[in-house]
Amino acid sequence: MAPTLQQAYRRRWWMACTAVLENLFFSAVLLGWGSLLIILKNEGFYSSTCPAESSTNTTQDEQRRWPGCDQQDEMLNLGFTIGSFVLSATTLPLGILMDRFGPRPVRLVGSACFTASCTLMALASRDVEALSPLIFLALSLNGFGGICLTFTSLTLPNMFGNLRSTLMALMIGSYASSAITFPGIKLIYDAGVAFVVIMFTWSGLACLIFLNCTLNWPIEAFPAPEEVNYTKKIKLSGLALDHKVTGDLFYTHVTTMGQRLSQKAPSLEDGSDAFMSPQDVRGTSENLPERSVPLRKSLCSPTFLWSLLTMGMTQLRIIFYMAAVNKMLEYLVTGGQEHETNEQQQKVAETVGFYSSVFGAMQLLCLLTCPLIGYIMDWRIKDCVDAPTQGTVLGDARDGVATKSIRPRYCKIQKLTNAISAFTLTNLLLVGFGITCLINNLHLQFVTFVLHTIVRGFFHSACGSLYAAVFPSNHFGTLTGLQSLISAVFALLQQPLFMAMVGPLKGEPFWVNLGLLLFSLLGFLLPSYLFYYRARLQQEYAANGMGPLKVLSGSEVTA
């Protein structure tokens, strides 16, 4: 029932559009936890932990049917902690599984888990006193299903050639913007729609993801455009010829003759044959398959190691702000002073709530900012050639052709140039974000919100595009998963930083923000290394005239 790779290629725009919608409404929806928390408390989850005589210290409205207390908040936040951990920690094993089995089975399992998550939450709400513990399993399945959908969608841009980075940025942007989903559901809930109805409807919509994947996603993984056998897999494997020539053999002849024609025609005075014999074709075809790059060399490459530091630092900066934004806003409103009267406390709560709502709504900007960084990564790629061939370089030198008169733009060099621009811009915005955090001006926080949202969309998109450009496509899932896992470990440091801010620093965020600002300067090390690596690669091209196959097998290892 699964389509072939050629059929999936013809449906690639449908798959891309539906993947964006699926990411937006079904991927990292746990990032909108604040709205879901209010719904769960209104439904009475873990209200049994509150004393019967409790007059909760949280705000209650007239529609509230259940008591609330700090114990209830702790239990529900524990569920969120488990779900968010699953969302981040499972990226590495998912990447390994996806590299081995392809995206189709992973996506099917992810959509099934998300469906089960919504169903469990709906069933648990029918008897919250007995079934409240199901929320832990439901949130775990929600996080796991969401990351499965996100990871598999990142392989789709391989079907779009020069638009790959832009499409990948759009996928990551829809993932980052999914934090708006639960606030939208809360609006529906506040309009009077029952929580059970909402969850069962959401579960039914998740079943459509399973159906869409079954009908349109192929069993094979999507090859990257720069792979040697990309054209064979996408365009030629289904080609039937009257002369009984198979797709593989036809591809071999086309590739061999293409390489021959791309070189300078040899002179008869050299004593070499000007034409290729059948033996030459067979001999060349034996060397045609791309040499496999070991995973350990990609893992130990300086590019990947520097990206781990940059992404971990940025993740810590972003997650800490998301965790402490309410406390920071409260400090800006109160100036660090406690207000005893209820009127003053209510005013502070309303102001913080308003700014928090604006910050949540701005997460949709990720859907617009992520394609922008993808456009930067795709800049002038379509005007590039793969690499200089040795025959071309030697022929030009022999005939006295000035290489400076015709300087082709090489794809590998251009991708590195675009990555340098993308990471430099992202780090500059991150530094600007850190500076605005240091300024005690409440209205300036709107600028801080915008910078935070842009950086959150930029750095994931830039990293994914860098990995796709530099490393072999069969390593993409493993490298991305390991990077996400390391970044999640870095993000755990936000808890002691938060405790230090609300404890010894008495709510003042200045010193923590200053330390994080200085730490964020390390992000410029990655584009600095990429600049050095690009210069070295340019020297190799100029000195050796490396061909495309040698570049693919050699330069990626030393990246």
UniProtKB/Swiss-Prot annotation:
PTM annotation (Phosphoserine): residues: 237, 262, 267
Keyword RNA-binding: no
Transmembrane stretches, start-end: 20-40, 78-98, 105-124, 131-151, 168-188, 191-211, 304-324, 357-377, 419-439, 446-466, 485-505, 510-530
Tissue: Ubiquitously expressed in fetus and adult. Highest expression in adult pancreas, liver, skeletal muscle. In fetus, highest expression in liver and lower levels in kidney, and lung. Exclusively expressed in the glomeruli along the glomerular capillary walls.
InterPro entries: MFS, MFS_trans_sf
GO biological process terms, semicolon-separated: amino acid transport; isoleucine transport; L-leucine transport; L-valine transmembrane transport; negative regulation of amino acid transport; negative regulation of L-leucine import across plasma membrane; neutral amino acid transport
Keyword rRNA processing among UniProt keywords: no
Subcellular location: Cell membrane; Apical cell membrane; Endoplasmic reticulum membrane
Predominant location: membrane
MF terms in GO: amino acid transmembrane transporter activity; L-amino acid transmembrane transporter activity; L-isoleucine transmembrane transporter activity; L-leucine transmembrane transporter activity; L-valine transmembrane transporter activity; neutral L-amino acid transmembrane transporter activity
Catalysed reactions, semicolon-separated: D-leucine(in) = D-leucine(out); L-leucine(in) = L-leucine(out); L-isoleucine(in) = L-isoleucine(out); L-methionine(in) = L-methionine(out)
Organism superkingdom: Eukaryota
Keywords: Amino-acid transport, Cell membrane, Endoplasmic reticulum, Glycoprotein, Membrane, Phosphoprotein, Transmembrane, Transmembrane helix, Transport
Record: glycosylation sites: 57, 212, 229
Topology term for the membrane: Multi-pass membrane protein
SUPFAM superfamilies: MFS general substrate transporter
GO CC terms in record: apical plasma membrane; endoplasmic reticulum membrane; plasma membrane; podocyte foot
Function in brief: Uniport that mediates the transport of neutral amino acids such as L-leucine, L-isoleucine, L-valine, and L-phenylalanine. The transport activity is sodium ions-independent, electroneutral and mediated by a facilitated diffusion.
Similarity comment: family membership: Belongs to the SLC43A transporter (TC 2.A.1.44) family.
Protein name: Large neutral amino acids transporter small subunit 3
Native source species: Homo sapiens
